Design a protein with these regions (language model features):
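Local cysteine-cluster metal-coordination motifs and their immediate loop/turn environment
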Residues: 2-8
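C-terminal structural segment of proteins
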Residues: 9-308
Length: 308
């Protein structure tokens, strides 16, 4: 579980309470700022200071520091490490460094050609100021259930490279996310890169989400990917987010559609099966059944677009 997880949850629920009491902090507690020159140096610092936190884009960390919801002894700034800022294609895989910003994903022609789902999703993340600061590694490490990129990695079948003092390991996206703001990342480890398979031209992808306003947290979202062959859908993956405690696949609905045409009748039947695998967690103003309805609306939209 991430050391930041309780703090992130607290950010969502405590700001109004603190403001109403008049005790909102706007400056962080004292900490030591460290800017390592290599990944190895960063890992050494994290190993020496168990309560240290990593600063990548800072989109989520800085508000938590300012509100004193986290008070680390050290903040390790990895933003200047070129080894974590790459876009490359090799052996059928697109590799994305953890420090790539959301705006980089949205603007990259390489990403557009190799993984259009990621580019489409990046354009939905927050507002331009957020996309200019937030990083792909930070989003995945934070594992916000309402985040766009974790669902995309799940839909594509991506994998995540993690590095610690003991070496590197690669974790499939399907097992990386374990709960609300929780991943398999261990203290002292850094998320180094993401890899996604470069898919054939017959694959089609759709990204969509529902929010009260553009840039708000999603009430429900969907990253969909499938292969259209002679009018029939194959290998369909429907990854929903902002529904449960982590992104999840609607396996039963996808299995029903395997080998079938995306006719209106088939799509409608598949929508009724989403609840077999997706079990939404309600929030104020958007209960479980409302979220499930949103998921159905998104699925119908996405599948209709894939069929067009």
């Amino acid at each position: 579980m991430s050391l930041l997880a309780p703090a992130v949850i607290a950010v969502r629920i405590s700001w109004e309470k603190r403001r109403n009491r008049g005790d909102v902090f706007v400056k962080p507690a004292p900490f030591n700022y460290v800017k390592p020159s290599s990944v190895g140096d960063a890992l050494s610092i994290l190993g020496e200071h168990p309560d240290a936190v990593v600063l990548a884009g800072g989109q989520s960390l800085l508000p938590m520091l300012n509100m004193r919801l986290v008070a680390p002894s050290h903040v390790v700034d990895i933003t200047g490490l070129p080894a974590l800022n790459e876009i490359s294609v090799a052996d059928g895989w697109l590799r994305l460094g953890a420090l790539l910003r959301h705006c980089d994903l949205a603007a990259s022609q390489t990403v557009a050609e190799a993984a259009p789902l990621l580019q489409e999703a990046a354009c939905h993340i927050g507002h331009p100021a957020i996309r200019n600061r937030g990083t792909i590694g930070g989003s995945l490490a934070l594992a916000d259930p309402a985040a766009e990129l974790p669902a995309c990695l799940l839909a594509i079948g991506g994998r995540i490279e993690i590095q610690g003092l003991d070496g590197k390991r690669v974790v499939e996206a399907a097992t990386f996310f374990t709960g609300t703001f929780e991943t398999v990342l261990k203290q002292g480890e850094i998320l180094r890169a993401v890899e996604v398979p470069v898919l054939a031209a017959e694959y089609r992808s759709v990204f969509d989400e529902l929010a009260r306003r553009h840039g708000d947290y999603a009430l429900a979202g969907l990253a969909a990917l499938g292969r259209i062959n002679n009018g029939n859908v194959r290998d369909l993956r429907l990854a929903f987010f902002a529904a449960g405690d982590k992104p999840a696949l609607a396996v039963t609905a996808a299995q029903f559609l395997e080998g079938k045409t995306l006719s209106e009748a088939n799509i409608d039947e598949a929508v009724t099966l989403i609840g077999d695998d997706i079990h939404p967690i309600g929030q104020p103003g958007c209960g479980e059944q409302t979220k499930l309805h949103h998921c159905g609306v998104l699925a119908k939209r996405a599948l209709s677009r894939m069929a067009a």
